[in-house]
């Protein structure tokens, strides 16, 4: 059985980041709601308590009885988690005189404490809290301080229980990964045996046992998640897997043909469906973004359902759902707040059992598994692309001509990123067709044509993103190529908005 660390989620925006950092230590972990600890699970080696947007003294704050956990497992409380343990054991937590957000330095810490093994003097940590621990219980010992925070970390004397006021999981905490390694490996004793190869071996065995000789259908999008899921399933059940790739007419230029070729080279059994006329007809005159998404979502379900029913004896629907989808689909109280983005509604409509072979993986782990499976690098490193495709990058109504313009402009931009060695430095990139026209001069003639916006961002998880600071020379070359080569465009802009407050996609 796979050993694991349990992360109790109290609602922090960085809880998933804790999970990713633990996984980077080649250790398996699971994120569960703060009140859903898996009692009786003998594979649990330690527990991490996340941060939270709440104050521990609020009536509405999330509270949990740790008596069955404390003493049985090592515990590390982060921010709210640290405050919660101090407060519920008789310590004091109060609003900070000055909220501390951003970089701080550990001015002193107990170098002989196992949590700080290998941590450098004055190391930078990341603070993000409005409350602070002002007094700790008698059996708690302060083990680190910053200039502004006297109790930056503590340990319960005689117990494997620690609390840190800062966020070791955040990139800006310079030795944060080392601290997590000290806890996960040295304290909890995890073996660090979680790897792409071990995941593939165990998952293929599980899929064979789960599916037997049953037939499975999977909807492909051309993206990383569904592609890796397909190759993994193909390794487990071979010809019993049938994949369906629907072209709604709003994919990137030549994408349907190129991706179908990739899938065939991977030995997948793929049915390609050109449903572009259906989608263009149903989208005619629609301008509201959410209506576009719903029309495309329903249309995909209808086409997929129709094609799947042509197959005989299918019992399972496979999806490329990944771990963040599963986490986001439940609130920390266990109620649904967001349905899976993959093929929402299909399992119920088709009366099929659901198979999600990647449901335990983060995005970066999906890519690592893809490499281990021998998939081509250009398929593994593809940028995220919205399910509705270019429909949400065309502001206003959608026509085949607008899609043609956007496909041509987007192709120049993306190929330019590849040619200049910039593609892998960017999390996501694309072109937006704006609902405006502008005056220009080409040759000796006045033009009145469309404007487009280039969008490229850097990110690690899409929760936050910064606009990519691409070279001016590159932007100038792309702008010139688009204006000269794409009929109908005479102006190019560059979107320099970050998320937040803007989103990555315009619609």
Swiss-Prot record:
Annotated protein name in UniProt: GMP synthase [glutamine-hydrolyzing]
According to the record's subunit comment, the protein's assembly and interactions are: Homodimer.
What's the stated role of this polypeptide?
A: Catalyzes the synthesis of GMP from XMP.
Span of domain GMPS ATP-PPase:
194-382
The yes or no answer to whether the keyword ATP-binding is present is yes
NCBIfam families (UniProt xref): guaA_Cterm, guaA_Nterm, PRK00074.1
Q: Which domain of life is it from?
A: Bacteria
Q: Which reaction does it catalyse?
A: XMP + L-glutamine + ATP + H2O = GMP + L-glutamate + AMP + diphosphate + 2 H(+)
Residues at the active site: 79 (nucleophile), 167, 169
Q: In which pathway does it act?
A: Purine metabolism; GMP biosynthesis; GMP from XMP (L-Gln route): step 1/1
A GO cellular component entry from the record: cytosol
Which residues does the record give as ATP binding sites? 221-227
Keywords of the record = ATP-binding, Glutamine amidotransferase, GMP biosynthesis, Ligase, Nucleotide-binding, Purine biosynthesis
Record's SUPFAM superfamilies?
Adenine nucleotide alpha hydrolases-like (SSF52402), Class I glutamine amidotransferase-like (SSF52317), GMP synthetase C-terminal dimerisation domain (SSF54810)
Q: Domain Glutamine amidotransferase type-1: where?
A: 4-193
Q: Mention any Pfam family matching this sequence.
A: NAD_synthase
Q: Name one GO molecular function term.
A: ATP binding
């Amino acid at each position: 059985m796979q050993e694991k660390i349990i992360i109790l989620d109290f609602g922090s925006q960085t809880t998933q980041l804790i999970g990713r950092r633990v996984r980077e230590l080649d250790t398996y972990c699971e994120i569960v709601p703060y009140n859903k600890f898996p009692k009786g699970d003998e594979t649990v080696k330690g527990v991490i308590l996340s941060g939270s947007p709440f104050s521990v003294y609020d009536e509405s704050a999330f509270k949990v009885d740790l008596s069955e956990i404390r003493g049985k497992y090592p515990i590390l409380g982060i921010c709210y988690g640290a405050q919660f343990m101090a407060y519920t054991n008789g310590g004091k937590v109060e609003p900070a005189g000055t909220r501390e957000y951003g970089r701080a330095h550990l001015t002193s810490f107990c170098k002989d404490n196992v949590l700080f093994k290998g941590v450098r003097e004055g190391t930078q940590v990341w603070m993000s809290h409005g409350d602070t621990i002002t007094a700790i219980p008698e059996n708690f010992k302060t083990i680190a301080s910053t200039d502004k925070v006297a109790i930056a970390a503590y340990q319960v004397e005689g117990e494997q229980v620690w609390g840190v006021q800062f966020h070791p999981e955040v990139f800006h905490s310079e030795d944060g990964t080392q601290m997590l390694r000290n806890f996960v490996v040295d304290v909890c004793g995890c073996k660090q045996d979680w790897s792409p190869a071990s995941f593939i071996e165990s998952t293929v065995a599980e899929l064979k046992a789960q599916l037997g000789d049953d037939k499975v259908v999977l909807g492909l999008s051309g993206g990383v998640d569904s592609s890796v899921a397909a190759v993994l399933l193909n390794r487990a059940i071979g010809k019993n897997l049938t994949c369906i790739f629907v072209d709604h007419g709003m994919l990137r230029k030549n994408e349907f043909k190129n991706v179908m070729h990739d899938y065939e080279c991977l030995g997948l059994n793929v049915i390609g469906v050109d449903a572009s006329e259906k989608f263009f007809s149903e989208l005619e005159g629609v301008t509201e973004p959410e209506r576009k998404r719903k029309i495309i979502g329903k249309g995909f379900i209808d086409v997929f359902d129709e094609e799947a029913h042509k197959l005989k004896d299918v019992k399972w629907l496979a999806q490329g759902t990944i771990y963040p989808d599963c986490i986001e689909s439940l609130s920390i109280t266990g109620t649904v707040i967001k349905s899976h983005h993959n093929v929402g509604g299909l399992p119920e409509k088709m009366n099929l059992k659901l198979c999600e072979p990647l449901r335990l993986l983060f995005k970066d782990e999906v890519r690592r598994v893809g490499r281990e499976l021998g998939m081509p690098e250009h398929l593994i490193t593809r940028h995220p692309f919205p399910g509705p495709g270019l429909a949400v990058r065309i502001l206003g109504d959608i026509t085949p001509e607008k899609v043609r313009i956007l496909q041509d402009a987007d192709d120049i931009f993306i190929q330019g990123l590849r040619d200049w060695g910039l593609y892998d430095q960017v999390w996501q990139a694309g072109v937006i067709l704006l609902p405006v026209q502008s005056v220009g001069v080409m040759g000796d003639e006045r033009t009145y044509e469309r404007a487009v916006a280039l969008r490229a961002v850097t990110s690690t998880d899409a929760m936050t993103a910064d606009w990519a600071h691409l070279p001016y020379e590159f932007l100038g070359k792309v702008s010139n190529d688009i204006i000269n080569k794409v009929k109908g465009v005479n102006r190019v802009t560059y979107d320099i908005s970050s998320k937040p407050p803007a989103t990555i996609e315009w619609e």
